[in-house]
């Protein structure tokens, strides 16, 4: 058993006993990177000249390895989508990093800090015509973290969350279309035509599946189509559904509307 490669302890106060592999792991752990993601900063904008892109002053971290592109030029293919890759080969001690323009994203996720091989990471996507560059799109810089706690957050794009759907035949002609977002919010659409139900009855059909059940009773309001009247139902923590609309005889009345509730 061995514990080594401390980043906080220098026995003689003159050396830093951490190798480049360990330093690479440190970068990746601090930023939530994996071997298919990058960090990139253009200190000055790349230049596009004919079928060439020149990275005038760009910093990149890939596989935890930091390097700089200073007036580095990549030849592009015409009438194509060019995926610009950084290739890190630690066996090439004089020039361990090279750039290549390829016709697809060939990022390979090779673990160069614990094993061997050449790491390929795409960091730019450049589209060309027959004579020059028509568009550029840097690769998204992604972090993977277990939990984030922030005091304030501004989002300019979209937030993607897991989505599940469920259709519940609640009984007595009432149907519910449930859409759950990120195990937090459930959006409910009412449809179907209700009959043979009394106020306060538990509905006779299917209960709500466990993943969609609220922690406390949730009351949702819908309306009867073509009428000026509404109804509400309770979705109970055990999944049962209680009708709190008017009592309805055997003549069906169409329902419409939407509601929502938080699971927790």
Curated annotation (Swiss-Prot):
Compartment annotation: Virion
Superkingdom of the source species: Viruses
Keywords of this entry: Host-virus interaction, Viral attachment to host cell, Viral attachment to host entry receptor, Viral baseplate protein, Viral tail protein, Virion, Virus entry into host cell
Annotated GO biological process: cell adhesion; entry receptor-mediated virion attachment to host cell; symbiont entry into host cell
Pfam families found in the cross-reference section: Caudo_bapla_N, Caudo_bapla_RBP, Caudo_bapla_RBP_neck
Protein name: Receptor binding protein
Free-text comment on this protein's domains from its UniProt entry: The C-terminus is involved in host receptor binding. Host-recognition domains point upwards, towards the capsid.
InterPro entries (alphabetical): Adenovirus_pIV-like_att, Caudo_bapla_N, Caudo_bapla_RBP, Caudo_bapla_RBP_neck
Chief location: virion
Similarity comment: family membership: Belongs to the skunalikevirus receptor binding protein family.
Ranges for region Host receptor binding: 164-264
Cellular component per GO, a single term: virus tail, baseplate
Entry keyword annotation includes Nucleus: no
Subunit structure and binding partners: Homotrimer; found as an assembly of 6 homotrimers. Interacts with host phosphopolysaccharides; this allows the virus to bind the external cell wall layer. Interacts with the distal tail protein.
UniProt function note: Binds to the host phosphopolysaccharides at the onset of infection. Upon activation by calcium, the receptor binding proteins change their conformation, presenting their binding sites to the host, and a channel opens at the bottom of the baseplate for DNA ejection.
